[in-house]
Amino acid sequence: MLIGSRFGQLFMTLAPPSAALFGWIILGETLSVQALIGMFVTLLGIGISVFHKGSSHKISLKLPLSGILFGIGAGVGQGVGLVLSKMGMNYYEASIPKEMTDSITMLPFAATFIRAITGAVGFIALLCVRGKWQEFGQALRDKRSMHMTWWATFTGPFIGVALSLMAVQYTETGIASTLMALTPIFIIAPAHWCFKQPVTYKEVLGAIISVFGVSLFFI
């Protein structure tokens, strides 16, 4: 771990502006001034919620360069990847015969399957390069962990990613990416109920600001 989960989440907020920028460059998408303000307000709320620790928990701003570069790459890559996924679905949709237009609704799931195959190839290559097959085998033998991992894979990379691609079918990638960046807000209540994690006023404030920012997209 180079920069920690909170800084990692903060760098991931680069995804919405990256998606908006490259959506404009590649797809010609435009956002209204109100939508851009909504994006800024939403990301501000997320930032406040992520850095919810009190004064007794000091946060060092002296981050390693490699961690910063990986964080920026992750955030920008997430945004650009969403734009490229939409481009791929647009090309495929344009090639579908008129009598098969009903299959358009299945495009996000087909695109998710393609992304999953590519991801699997990438992870296998990474395991080969780093020589971690023994640790991978040990993880597979942990039944409880594999059970939870299976459910996490089903709800996240399958259902979550498919719905995210469905979202970009019907709205601009910048708006869809901003809504997807709300994960740190959505996990506040489950983390409190399931793991008894205390909820601070800064988390609540960040959630309220984020909800207000999202509302600007729809009013």
Can you say where each PLM-predicted feature lies in the sequence?
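Short amphipathic alpha-helical coupling elements at transmembrane boundaries
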Residues: 1, 9-12, 138, 210
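Signature of the 12-TM Major Facilitator Superfamily
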Residues: 6-10, 33, 110-113, 175-178, ...
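Interfacial helix-capping/hinge residues at the ends of transmembrane alpha-helices
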Residues: 8, 23, 82-86, 164-165, ...
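Alpha-helical transmembrane segments of compact multi-pass small-molecule transporters, enriched
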Residues: 11-25, 118, 122, 159-160, ...
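Membrane-helix interface motif
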Residues: 78-97
